[in-house]
From Swiss-Prot:
Gene name, Swiss-Prot/TrEMBL: rsmH
Record SUPFAM superfamilies: Putative methyltransferase TM0872, insert domain, S-adenosyl-L-methionine-dependent methyltransferases
Taxonomic source organism: Bordetella pertussis (strain Tohama I / ATCC BAA-589 / NCTC 13251)
Protein task: Specifically methylates the N4 position of cytidine in position 1402 (C1402) of 16S rRNA.
GO terms under biological process: rRNA base methylation
Major enzyme class: transferase
Binding residue positions for S-adenosyl-L-methionine: G55, G56, H57, D75, F101, D122, Q129
Main localization (coarse): cytoplasm
Molecular-function annotations in GO: rRNA (cytosine-N4-)-methyltransferase activity
Gene Ontology cellular-component annotations: cytoplasm
Protein name, as recorded: Ribosomal RNA small subunit methyltransferase H
Region (Disordered): 333-364
Record field: catalytic activity: cytidine(1402) in 16S rRNA + S-adenosyl-L-methionine = N(4)-methylcytidine(1402) in 16S rRNA + S-adenosyl-L-homocysteine + H(+)
Record-linked Pfam families: Methyltransf_5
Enzyme Commission number, as recorded: 2.1.1.199
Length: 364
């Protein structure tokens, strides 16, 4: 079954990678300041789409690249990879990797690529994944409680909920869903699974709905819990941290990073990474160093873009989207590389911290 997918912020994302004078709100480039040599980059550059999905952003970028350019696309989703391979079969510039963007550095190195001209990431869940009940992402459609981006490996949400403690569930839901009723939700899930296994999305949604005492306007009470479980089961924030670090390591001078995020946890990580790399001297402000001894910016922020009213009217998913863009300077990488500018989340497999006395989920 085919599901429609409309890429969010399509034109500004591609513009961010190819236009030398691109600048969104808050861009640090001054008017008239020259950008990178766009003609050379478009004809011979190497670009990365870390979240191929159904290929909307990739196709739009390919339409503006030259015949000698290369585009390496990544995705965990087997259905997305099938679409990507069809595209690659008809366009020799495209190379396909079945894997997440966290493996970007290793996969590019294996292909002899040491430097790239652009990296784009469209974070979150695609419309086809949400609309397909069998994937288990939606609390509005009944389906298996799965939520894996890559359905060929790893535990499902149902697997994890069947064995997680109340404390583990509480912390995941509080940290990754920013749910203030996380403790109540965790206890409700434990009570529900004691009477019958939780195998479907609607079972979980009904269980959670009874524990969330107030509703945010226009938001289903299970929204934050589903978000938290999806992020946790796919290790989304840990993988984003690795991808951002790899992008800083791989981008050549003038290369661009364009990231679309859909919730505050992702956007905060992207924003903080760009800010840290653009203003590394801030971390040394209290040290008795001469200006010449301070670290120089690794990137220049090119600002952010949000969807206009026209796009939001035609695609509700665009309402929460934020595109942030950065341009690599010619400054050499510091010891430790790009990882030093990224605040990583939970390490995959790290034990969940226990509940503090009296804690019932934290407000954020």
């Amino acid at each position: 079954m085919e599901f429609e997918h409309r890429p969010v912020l399509l034109e500004p994302t591609v513009d961010a990678l190819v236009l030398p004078d691109f600048g969104g709100k808050g861009a640090h480039r001054q008017a008239g300041e020259p950008g990178p040599d766009a003609a050379t980059r478009l004809q011979h550059g190497v670009f990365v789409d870390g979240t191929f999905g159904r290929g909307g952003h990739s196709r739009a970028l390919l339409a503006r690249l030259g015949a000698q350019a290369r585009l390496v696309v990544f995705d965990k989703d087997p259905q997305a990879i099938a679409v990507a391979r069809e595209l690659a079969a008809g366009d020799g510039r495209v190379e396909v990797v079945h894997g997440g963007f966290a493996t970007m550095a290793e996969e590019l190195t294996a292909r002899g690529i040491e430097q790239v001209d652009g990296v784009m990431l469209d974070l979150g869940v695609s419309s086809p994944q949400i609309d397909d009940a069998e994937r288990g992402f939606s609390f509005m459609r009944d389906g298996p409680l799965d939520m894996r981006m890559d359905t060929t490996r790893g535990p499902t949400v149902a697997d994890w909920l069947a064995q997680a403690s109340v404390d583990e569930m509480r912390e995941v839901i509080a940290d990754y869903g920013e749910e203030r009723f996380a403790f109540q939700v965790a206890k409700a899930i434990a009570a529900c699974r004691a009477t019958r296994p939780l195998h479907t999305t609607l079972q979980l949604a009904e269980c959670v709905a009874g524990a969330v005492r107030t509703r945010e306007k226009g938001q289903h009470p299970a929204t934050r819990t589903f978000q938290a479980l999806r992020i946790y089961i796919n290790r989304e924030l840990e993988e984003l941290a690795r991808a951002l670090a790899s992008a800083l390591d791989l981008l050549g001078p003038g290369g661009r990073l364009a990231v679309i995020s859909f919730h505050s946890l992702e956007d905060r990580m992207v924003k903080q990474c760009i800010a840290a790399a653009a203003r590394p001297a801030a971390a040394h402000a209290r040290l008795p160093l001469r200006e010449s001894e301070l670290p120089q910016p690794l990137v220049r922020s090119l600002g952010k873009v949000v969807a206009d009213d026209v796009e939001v009217a035609g695609n509700a998913r665009a309402r929460s989207a934020i595109l942030r863009v950065a341009e690599r300077t010619g400054e050499p990488l510091p010891p430790g590389g790009g990882a030093g500018f990224v605040k990583a989340g939970r390490v995959p497999g790290e034990p969940v911290r226990g509940t503090r006395a009296g804690s019932k989920g934290r407000r954020r």
